[in-house]
Amino acid sequence: MFSITTLRDWTPDPGSIICWHASPTAKAKARQAPISEVPPSYQQAQHLRRYRDHVARGLDMSRLMIFTWDLPGRCNIRAMNYAINAHLRRHDTYHSWFEFDNAEHIVRHTIADPADIEVVQAEHQNMTSAELRHHIATPQPLQWDCFLFGIIQSDDHFTFYASIAHLCVDPMIVGVLFIEIHMMYSALVGGDPPIELPPAGRYDDHCVRQYADTAALTLDSARVRRWVEFAANNDGTLPHFPLPLGDLSVPHTGKLLTETLMDEQQGERFEAACVAAGARFSGGVFACAALAERELTNCETFDVVTTTDTRRTPTELRTTGWFTGLVPITVPVASGLFDSAARVAQISFDSGKDLATVPFDRVLELARPETGLRPPRPGNFVMSFLDASIAPLSTVANSDLNFRIYDEGRVSHQVSMWVNRYQHQTTVTVLFPDNPIASESVANYIAAMKSIYIRTADGTLATLKPGT
């Protein structure tokens, strides 16, 4: 199983540290890279603008995807050097950097020849755990080399780490790193030739297609109308976490909390209940949140947005980049019945997947003032389901690598929730503003949700009454 935690909680085993940095020659080539006509994706543009705005206000925004895993023995530096450089040269998401040429316009620069990209190893002497954590958290999205790779060599094993700007990747990078760095490295040190990989897709091509698709949208487009209707039912924007979160005008660092919802047997019984209701496990996840919110707030309709991967074609599935989109979900829960909630939640999720290709930012651009639409406010709620019991994530989750994912614990304005299904248990991880009011609210939400999972799995969930 892999774990999700904050970077400040990571205390690696003592050892010598070797980090791969962009070479001076590669940095010079990047600075000279010509302007590209390829636009940033909507995800990238939103991220860059948020980062710039946070910096202007003196705030430190989360911006990285950080991973570690352990391997036995001593690291073969030559083999690891090959694996890392091959990965960076293979994927065009690493070949660009961005700058603002005026208040809003973002310009992309692209290195023409992937062979010009090179990272070289450097040993860091006498670095403490705190210094290492700071070092790993340094990449920022307005630099080309917004990625770091390295190892910590202990007596009988080494820990590999990767710190990559979210600008370049999304959660699917987990499987990519496992194959292209871990498995490639293992093949090389085992005396085998480099793993043969199919041609990678181009994220640039996705950005061009996305720009053309979103440029063709109007307020009359069906996908836009559905977003407008969803936002109108949530005070003109995306849904807010239903319980108090404290004063969010004051910046708070993010706090991460993980709780077990069900063991393996309970998870199997819960899935059977979902299927009996005409849903899948994912529908049951949103149903439990909806019923928990009904218990806590007496609401009769549950609204939330969830993340999903928008890769669809075989080429896109081989493309590294930021493809994550949002799906709006609405679940009526007046009946208080799990079966009906799960069934409707599944329908809402499945029928809303095509909306993930329409960024909410684009809807805001198209919206007329009379629609009353506005950007998400602090405290918005994003809920995701991650199934690590099936491929490709099961390969990582079931390995003996001690695979870990880290959040930086920087300023957090929203509540992000991940329900994670593993082979032997189901957990929930929540990232939220670190203050006493938000902590109490999140704890109450998790407790209510866990109770519904357990009662559903045990077949003891009767019709729920508000406030019970």
Swiss-Prot record:
It comes from the Bacteria. GO terms for molecular function: acyltransferase activity, transferring groups other than amino-acyl groups. It catalyses: 2-O-sulfo-alpha,alpha-trehalose + hexadecanoyl-CoA = 2-O-sulfo-2'-O-hexadecanoyl-alpha,alpha-trehalose + CoA. Gene3D superfamilies: Chloramphenicol acetyltransferase-like domain, Nonribosomal peptide synthetase, condensation domain. SUPFAM superfamilies: CoA-dependent acyltransferases. Its EC number is 2.3.1.288. Disruption phenotype: Null mutant does not produce SL-1. Disruption of the gene does not alter the virulence of M.tuberculosis in mice. InterPro entries: CAT-like_dom_sf, Condensatn. It is an enzyme of class 2 (transferase). Keywords: Acyltransferase, Cell wall biogenesis/degradation, Lipid biosynthesis, Lipid metabolism, Transferase. GO terms for biological process: cell wall organization; sulfolipid biosynthetic process. Belongs to the PapA acyltransferase family. Required for the biosynthesis of sulfolipid-1 (SL-1), a major mycobacterial cell wall lipid. Catalyzes the acylation of trehalose-2-sulfate by adding the palmitoyl group at the 2'-position to yield the intermediate trehalose-2-sulfate-2'-palmitate (SL659). This is Trehalose-2-sulfate acyltransferase PapA2. It comes from Mycobacterium tuberculosis (strain ATCC 25618 / H37Rv). The gene is papA2.
